[in-house]
Each structure stands twice: as structure tokens, then as C-alpha cells.
């Protein structure tokens, strides 16, 4: 999710992707003085550069320009298969809890995957261009997406339909819910627009100095922003004022993550300069953070996530290995129609053979 994780033990791992097609795993080892970051695995995961990585309490998913999503069981430290459905670059990934993974791609699709059997439950024709970013509401009932068709779209995940479309006149690169889900941030080039959920209108704008590449809500009122100017800035979301600024790297900042440790926040940054750095930050009295530890991966990093183990319930049926999913409908939201037009927006669902219904415009039908 978008807020700081709370660490219940000392098992913290960082997973990073890079232009060189490699996935790196590192264990964070806290100490009284300098923290250390120790390598746990290196895997040549893809045949093209990585664009996205996301974590649940058991799995890591990575997305690449090679059109595949690769899965890893972090508890067993083994590969868990690949998801093959998108036609084009995988641009964004997000787990919701332990049950679902959402993926967005260059093909304009958003796919909803079940993590139990790694089936594609639903395929949504989300944007006319590329899906550049998506974010799931903390409740799991809504999702936001932005794309190269200059629209911001809200999706009803319970009914599997488009709920709202907003023309934003520019292509947005990032969309992100706040931890409380009462607001969300949308990045367009060098600015962040803050929207309220109630009215879906902009309540403030944060102006950055250069192009923005990453965002992280440290808590509902604090937003960390990184981009092409090597610095990280932390903003008060209500006033849109910068409350902290520090130089984090020697090159552009590509990813920001965070987790809580004891009474402070650990900010994790990754850059094209190859470094992953850990910063100690007090969220109650914001001051320049202290560098806890760093590691030079010698790779051009593109994405990063924090992984921590969670409790998993033993079941008689073990999760299946991931394969290409082409013939599954969502058991929670049965789809009777293949082409659904709701409030003027067309949503195309998979039929039972993975094909799409073609033909002329039909009468409006409802998702049951």
C-alpha cells in the first residue's frame, strides 16, 4: 500500500529491478550504528529492462518491456512462474492484500489476477493508449488509473466497471491513493495535483523543479517526491509546502519506499547511480534525515519495493504455479456480456475462450 509499513521483526528485504534485466534481493540488517544491506539473491529475470515491481506478504511480481510478469515466492526463495497476457510493456503492478494482483500495460489493459491459482479474473480495456499507472483504494473497492489518452479513470472493482472518467488534458505518469483513501495524487510532468475523493476536484498543486519519477505517502499528510534533480522533497499535503529537502543521490531518483521501525520512518531511495540508500526520518518533527546505510548495486535501477513476510494460512489446496491465463471469469463478479457500455464508456471483458466479442454497437448491458 502507499503508507509506511510497520516492521514487526527484523526481517526486511528490498527487491529492485534495473535496465540490465536483473532482479536484486537484499536483506536489511538494522544496527545501533550503521545499517547494512546484504545481498540475498540476483536473478536474470527478464529479456528486457524492468519497469515495475510489487510485493505481497509472500510474493514478488516484476514487470518488464518483454511483456511478461514474473513471480517469485519470497518465503521459499524460488521462481513461481510467469503471467503472459499483456501485448506490450508491463508498465505498472500493484498487489491488493494477499488475494489479488493488478497489472497495467502498453496495450491499454488492466488485468486483475487471483493469487490463489494465478488466473486472470478480469481484463478491462482501460485506456485508448498505454496505462501508465494504477492505484488500488485501501478499501479494495476502487482503483484509479491514468494513461496516455489524457484521462484519469476510476474503476469500481466490486462490479468490474468504469465508475468515473475525468479528462485532464495532459498525460499523467503516476496516480497514488493516500493511506486513508480520502485523497489521491496525480503526477503530470513536474507537478503533483492533489484530488479529494468526495468531489474528484483538485484541492492543491505541488510544483517540483524537474520531472517527477516517484511518489510515496509517508502518512496521510506527508508526501515524499523524487525526480530528475537528485533530491527528495517532503511536502505537507494540506498546505502543499515543502517541509524537508535533501540531496539523496548523484543522479535522478527512480524509486521511493518506506517502512516504520520502532518510532521512526525508514525512507528507502533508489537511483540511476546504482545506489540504494536508507534514511532515518522522524515523522513528528520533520528534519533532514540521517543516512542509515547504503549499497552500490552497480546497475541502473528503475524500480524498488519493500518485502516483509506475513502469516499465511495452510490450506489443503496449494497455490498453483502461474501460467498463461486465458479462459477464466471472475467468480465473484459473473460477466454475462462480453462488451459492456456503461455511462458511455466501453469495457471489454474476456469470454470463456479469452477472445473479445466484435461487432456493431449493442444495447447497454449490465454487469451482474
From Swiss-Prot:
Where does the record say this protein resides?
Nucleus, Nucleolus
The record's WD repeats, renumbered to this chain, cover 45-82, 85-123, 126-165, 207-245, 248-289
Asked if the keyword Repeat belongs to this entry, the reply reads yes
**GO BP, one example?**
negative regulation of signal transduction
User: What are the record's GO terms for cellular component?
Assistant: nucleolus
**Chief location category:** nucleus
* Single GO MF descriptor: protein kinase inhibitor activity
Q: Which UniProt keywords apply?
A: Nucleus, Repeat, Ribosome biogenesis, Signal transduction inhibitor, WD repeat
| Role this protein plays | Negatively regulates the PAK1 kinase. PAK1 is a member of the PAK kinase family, which has been shown to play a positive role in the regulation of signaling pathways involving MAPK8 and RELA. PAK1 exists as an inactive homodimer, which is activated by binding of small GTPases such as CDC42 to an N-terminal regulatory domain. PAK1IP1 also binds to the N-terminus of PAK1, and inhibits the specific activation of PAK1 by CDC42. May be involved in ribosomal large subunit assembly.
In Swiss-Prot or TrEMBL terms, this protein is called: p21-activated protein kinase-interacting protein 1-like
Please name the gene that encodes this protein. pak1ip1
